Swiss-Prot record:
InterPro entries: DNA_ligase_AS, DNA_ligase_B, DNA_ligase_CS, DNAligase_adenylation, DNAligase_N, NA-bd_OB-fold, NAD_dep_DNA_ligaseB, NAD_DNA_ligase_OB. This is DNA ligase B. One of its GO terms (molecular function) is DNA ligase (NAD+) activity. Keywords: DNA damage, DNA repair, DNA replication, Ligase, NAD.
């Protein structure tokens, strides 16, 4: 009873999460958005099944199809059947293809496994499903999955695939098998190589009119033997003897979700002879084949891998001004998971780059992780029907603006605070952008060093700053006073690298102010252009005012 209650709660939570992400559209707009995406997916399907070509990556197709289904459920439409081929000249399957239900996570899989025994895990091979019918020991018919009840006659094509046994004996002599035709790979590592659009490539080869030698690049993985031997071990042995060796090699007994997770992770990183997109867990005990129907298999489930790239909805476009005054564009996203990382924002780059991408709220973009786990945009895979793009701020900022706070300087001013607190500058540990915003909003800083005047009481009474953290911050701010002179000059944004600044041997503000352009130009990595920037910087009125203020605070190197 407890198990069923847990399953019910899990389902309700899943339904709640679906409704929580329903778009806030009017009925008219919902109809338009659903219709447009439905038409696009239908166009992709037509090309896929009629010409054997894929105009879109498998992963993008799957995720946009799921997005369409979600929208249809949100607005009361009938969800479409995904990847349903035309049924001209279709052949009945002796045993229906049931399909496989997907588990959202390990917990859901664990709940499913608790009620079952004699369980086995197999790789979820990424290809196209097929029925193989053997009669009197010979391959009699090969049928594409189709809609699960009917499919296309693929007998001629499959007979040319050398990996498919044309004759069998013993219990298999009069049998029906279900499996996956896949693209044979040598040492395919899913974690590194991804899906390589394998499903579309296999479909393309099977749909071509010419019987080319390329069919020998295909293999078959049998995952079901309806009405076969009762024991899984007997099934695997007979299949291996007949030539279906991969099934025995890649089918393992499992007792719980932890064991499945270990195998799943192993196959994710291992060299395999095929592309996979997860694992399938199945019970050895299956109902008689006459009870098999599409979408009604309770004896097996899939636990798919997380896609290397995820389709994410753009919720908003935001503009940020960096410490140098450059405007960058950030897309705020509906949260997606990438490699156990929750991604809600992705940097687009400059305003020009954003305009080239042509991204607006409501668009669907493909996001992946670049080096060091930084999210990046790979493509814009779908644009909404109604697109309103925000106006970027005026390009009025530069490297010498916003040392002092003002309404128009809000973003660049905060960026300067974040910069000066960094480890390589003043090393103010424990405070980031959110903390600086909280301090500035409460205490209305005059300039980028106003935080030096904050008292322990002021820090303790700052909304958004925990009382336990306020004492630590006050200690950090006091320690900053003892930082070397060069660190403070870096905090002021001098346009030099740390190496060049250290090589200058400048030890005081007065010495720095009297240094000439020729002096700066001689420093390593500093040309005439950079030297002129240093002169402009030190002669700027805001910089001079900050220097005088730091002198009054008796900061090292600034004293008269």
């Amino acid at each position: 009873m407890k198990v069923w209650m847990a399953i019910l709660i899990s389902i309700l939570c899943w339904q709640s999460s679906v409704w929580a992400v329903c778009p806030a559209w009017s009925p008219a707009r919902a109809q338009e958005e659903i219709s447009r995406l439905q038409q696009q997916i239908k166009q992709w399907d037509d090309v896929y099944w009629k010409e054997g070509k894929s105009e879109v990556e498998d992963g993008v197709y799957d995720q946009l199809s799921a997005r369409l289904t979600q929208w249809q459920r949100c607005f009361g439409s009938e969800p479409r059947d995904v990847m349903m081929p035309p049924l001209n000249g279709a052949v009945m399957h002796p045993v229906a293809h049931t399909g496989v239900r997907k588990m959202v996570d390990k917990n859901a899989l664990s709940l499913w496994m608790r009620e079952r025994s004699d369980l086995w895990v197999q790789p979820k091979v990424d290809g196209v499903a097929v029925t193989l019918v053997y009669r009197d020991g010979k391959l009699n018919k090969a049928i594409s999955r189709g809609n699960g009840l009917k499919g296309e006659d693929w007998t001629q094509k499959v007979s040319l695939i050398s990996a498919v046994p044309q004759t069998v004996s013993g219990p298999l002599a009069n049998s029906t098998l279900q499996g996956e035709i896949f693209l044979q790979r040598e040492g395919h590592i899913q974690q590194q190589m991804g899906g390589i659009n394998a499903r579309a490539k296999v479909a393309g080869l099977m749909m071509r009119q010419d019987d080319s030698d390329t069919l020998n690049s295909l293999g078959v993985f049998v995952w079901a033997w309806p009405d076969g031997p009762q024991l899984m071990s007997d099934r695997l042995k007979e299949l291996a003897t007949a030539g279906f060796t991969l099934t025995q090699t890649y089918t393992r007994a499992v007792k719980n979700a932890d064991e499945v997770a270990r195998v799943r992770n192993e196959w994710w990183k291992a060299e395999l002879p095929f592309v996979t997109d997860g694992v399938v867990v199945r019970a050895a005990k299956e109902p008689e084949s006459r009870h098999w129907l599409p979408g009604q298999a309770e004896w097996l489930v899939a636990w798919k891998y997380q896609p290397v790239a995820q389709v994410a909805e753009v919720k908003a476009i935001q503009f940020a001004v960096g410490k140098s005054g450059k405007i960058s564009v950030v897309a705020s996203l509906a949260p997606v998971m990438l490699d156990d990382k929750k991604v809600q924002r992705v940097n687009i780059g400059s305003v020009r780059r954003w305009q080239e991408w042509d991204i607006a709220p409501g668009d669907q973009i493909l996001v992946s992780l670049a080096g060091q786990g930084i999210p990046r945009i790979d493509d814009v895979v779908w644009r909404g029907a109604e697109r309103t793009k925000p106006t970027p701020p005026e390009n009025r900022f530069n490297s010498l603006t916003c040392y002092f706070a003002s309404d128009v300087c809000q973003e660049q001013f905060i960026s300067r605070l974040v910069w000066l607190g960094a480890k390589q500058v003043l090393g103010l540990d424990g405070i980031g952008e959110a903390g600086w915003r909280a301090l500035h909003q409460t205490h209305r800083f005059e300039h980028i060093f106003s935080w030096l005047l904050l008292t322990p009481e002021q820090l303790q009474n700052t909304p958004g700053i925990a009382k336990s953290k306020s004492a630590q911050l006050w200690h950090q701010f006091n320690l900053a006073r003892k930082q070397p002179f060069t660190r403070w000059v870096m905090a002021m944004g001098i346009p030099l690298t740390r190496a060049a600044l250290n090589a200058s041997d400048e030890r005081s503000w007065s010495q720095l102010l009297f240094s000439t352009e020729q002096f700066w130009q001689q420093l390593p990595g500093t040309g005439s252009g950079r030297a002129r920037q240093v002169i402009e910087w030190k002669e700027n009125a805001q910089i001079k005012k900050l220097g005088s203020w730091l002198a009054a605070q008796q900061i090292t190197g600034f004293e008269p």
